[in-house]
Structures are given as structure tokens and as C-alpha cells.
């Protein structure tokens, strides 16, 4: 990633929200919390962690500090009397990698992944994709069309020429006004997320994060 940034300094790097959310859920699995994830309270909290990606970058750290930590301790207190239950390992992972842990002076260290990489608020505002699923889908389809893992140079060139013609046709269809259909369930979910983001200033951090979290699946 650093090498890419040095070679293309003017390019804006944006991470994939799907892979971002999967990183969080893998921590749930790693710490043996899959059964706890069935609980609506715990599941909502984990999804609220992922929902921080939809908060404006300037407010993301404050949202983490004022909302998520408080809810984490409430959950810990609620369940710790009954079993060894805590969301703290997931919160620690999130803070180290995406927020930055405070040093002795109270200043936050740089996280492993900067906020500008995983925050998708502006992408929602500008109606830009939040994942690279379409790219991965194309790669999968292209590999399937080759019908082998190591094609000859000529077979690869023939398939690239064919793909180019297909994309020329797609561009022509778009210019003619043909629209790309999206499954109803995805369209409705996206519309809800857009509405919550647009109404950001009328909610507290906790309300906003819950609103986004109700529309997320990890």
C-alpha cells in the first residue's frame, strides 16, 4: 500500500467496506464469540463498530470514544455475571488498527490503517461504490472464461479482445440510457443508509451508529 502511494501520490486510496467489516467479524470468531453474536445486543454493538466508517472523518474518533467504549462496558457488565463474556478484545483490535491507541500523553498514535482509507462517508454522499465486489466479480468471471489457471499467451490475448468488445457494448448501452438493475433488497438497504447519512446532524453518535448498524450484515 505504501509502495502504491509513493508511485501514485495523486490517487485517492479507498478501502473496501466489505473487507473492513469482515476484519471485525473475524475478531469475533478468533475470540470465540460466535455464539454471543447471536445475541441482538452484542451483534448490534459489533455492527456499530463497523458503522463508524459512515461517520464523517472529523468525528470518527469522537464517536468511538463517546459511544462505543461506553456501550462495550455496559455489555460487559450485563453479561459478565453469567459467563465469560466481553467485547473488549474486539474493541482493542479496532482501536489499534483503525483508530489509534492513546499514548501516555493522551495523544492517539497513528493506526495501522488510516481513517481516510476505511471511512466511506464521503463515498456515500457522492454515491460512489463502498466495496470492490464488482471488480472481484469481474476477475472471477474472467478467470472462469479462460477455463484454466495458466492460459497460453494467445488464449489470454483472445479473451482480452473479447472482453474489450463486451465492455464497448456495455458503454454504448449506458450512453443510450440503459440502466444497471440492482436487486430490490440491496437497493432498499442502500437507500436507507443514504437517508441516515443525510440526516447525520440531527442525531447523537449512538443514534446514528445504531441507524447504520441496523442496515449492516457482517
Functional labels for PLM-detected ranges:
Residues 1-188, 196-200, 205, 216-218:
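Extended amphipathic alpha-helical interaction segments
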Amino acid at each position: 500500500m505504501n509502495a502504491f502511494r509513493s508511485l501514485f501520490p495523486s490517487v485517492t486510496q479507498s478501502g473496501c467496506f466489505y473487507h473492513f467489516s469482515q476484519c471485525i467479524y473475524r475478531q469475533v470468531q478468533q475470540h470465540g464469540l460466535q455464539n454471543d453474536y447471536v445475541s441482538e445486543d452484542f451483534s448490534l454493538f459489533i455492527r456499530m463498530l463497523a458503522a463508524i466508517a459512515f461517520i464523517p472523518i472529523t468525528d470518527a474518533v469522537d464517536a468511538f470514544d463517546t459511544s462505543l467504549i461506553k456501550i462495550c462496558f455496559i455489555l460487559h457488565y450485563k453479561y459478565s455475571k453469567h459467563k465469560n463474556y466481553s467485547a473488549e478484545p474486539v474493541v482493542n483490535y479496532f482501536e489499534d488498527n483503525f483508530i489509534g491507541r492513546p499514548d501516555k500523553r493522551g495523544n492517539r498514535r497513528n493506526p495501522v490503517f488510516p481513517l481516510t482509507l476505511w471511512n466511506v462517508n464521503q463515498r456515500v454522499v457522492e454515491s460512489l461504490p463502498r466495496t470492490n465486489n464488482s471488480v472481484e466479480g469481474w476477475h472471477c468471471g474472467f478467470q472462469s472464461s479462460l477455463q484454466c489457471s495458466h492460459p497460453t499467451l494467445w488464449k489470454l490475448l483472445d479473451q482480452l479482445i473479447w472482453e474489450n468488445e463486451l465492455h464497448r457494448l456495455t458503454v454504448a448501452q449506458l450512453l443510450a440510457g440503459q440502466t444497471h438493475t440492482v436487486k430490490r433488497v440491496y437497493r432498499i438497504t442502500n437507500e436507507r443508509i443514504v437517508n441516515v447519512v443525510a440526516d447525520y446532524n440531527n442525531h447523537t453518535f449512538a443514534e446514528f451508529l445504531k441507524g447504520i448498524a441496523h442496515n449492516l450484515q457482517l
